[in-house]
Amino acid sequence: MRYLTAGESHGPQLTTIIEGLPSLLPITAEKINHDLKRRQGGHGRGRRMQIETDTVEIVAGVRHGQTLGSPVALVVANDDWKHWTKIMGAEPLAEDVNPEDIKRQISRPRPGHADLVGGMKYGHRDLRNVLERSSARETTVRVAVGSVAKALLNELGISIVAHVTEIVGIKADTSLVEGKTVDEIRAIVEADPCYCVDPVASAKMVDAIDEAKKAGDSIGGVVEVIVEGMPAGIGSYVHYDRKLDAKLAAAMLSINAFKGVEFGLGFEMARRKGSEVHDEIIWTEEEGYTRATNRLGGLEGGMSTGMPIVVRGVMKPIPTLYKPLQSVDIETKEPFKASVERSDSCAVPAASVVAEHVIAWEIATVILEQFHSDQLPQLKAQIDEHRQYTKGF
């Protein structure tokens, strides 16, 4: 299973084509739109989210609410396009038009963004050609793709949720998720302005975000994704590129501004002894093989153990600052303050939604690689058989 996305931040639309979905999978625009709305929310979003109302249009591969087995095409329109039709138009400029009047060219790259190196790589003197595609706006359609993947996982008894565990050093009490189902965690998260399970920490996060906004600065944080209902043995120890944790790490780091990833106890493992890290194996007739703890985050040897998968990612502060850092004009080579584009003071809550969906996509992809089927009922039967096998092993 694979997908491609196309579209610029201020272009007419974002488009994706998904190939490899089994037929007979229930999909509705309503469910995808719910996830798109979550991505637009969270305290700290900028003015762009006041302009856009992201909704998906399913234009191919689905009929009467079910996939056909052919490629699925999704489109999310950019409402702001009407203000950028001349600036971002695909057709060559007319001879009597002064390019400087409409292009809004950028020659002062922002530190920490793709602007300068992207311009070098693709030969763009106008750095807008870089930032329009490197913008996190592209994650809109990745959430739509992940929402489709979640629909598939839901049919297989696998559920997923993400929440914010830290913003600018303010840490949530993550023990509050213990003993709760994914649905229970989601209900708490969706009602919170920072998508956090800890209301005390969330209130402090809100204050910190507001302070950063007033200062023209930005702040980052940490998000956690929990996957419940995973069968054991998904992934492989045989080759490096089939390890499930490696694939999930790559997915997390593919999100704009994400710079680190960990599983289970994560980097805390470096400060513990082996007896305090590894999960003891137990067996019961009711559950089969399970673990006494879940310090490794549901992964051993590049494979799922059947315990909940727990993966965290760290997001750096957004590089677009309203009090910009020092940069250099690539045309004059003179020092200047970096260019300023509309941006968020903190996008960690929104990024947690993106993380949830890229992880969902990766897990769905690995499952379909391991249990390939052209139609959903056959896939469900294979998963059920696999679960019975691992339970009785």
Swiss-Prot record:
User: One GO molecular-function annotation for this sequence?
Assistant: FMN binding
What reaction does this catalyse? 5-O-(1-carboxyvinyl)-3-phosphoshikimate = chorismate + phosphate
What residues bind FMN, as annotated? 133-135, 256-257, 301, 316-320, 342
Where NADP(+) is bound, by residue? 39, 45
**Pathways involved:** Metabolic intermediate biosynthesis; chorismate biosynthesis; chorismate from D-erythrose 4-phosphate and phosphoenolpyruvate: step 7/7
Q: What does this protein do?
A: This reaction introduces a second double bond into the aromatic ring system.
What does the sequence similarity comment in the record state about its family? Belongs to the chorismate synthase family.
Outline the subunit composition: Homotetramer.
Q: What is this protein called?
A: Chorismate synthase
Give the species this sequence originates from: Lysinibacillus sphaericus (strain C3-41)
What's the source species' lineage?
Answer: Bacteria, Bacillati, Bacillota, Bacilli, Bacillales
Q: Which gene encodes it?
A: aroC
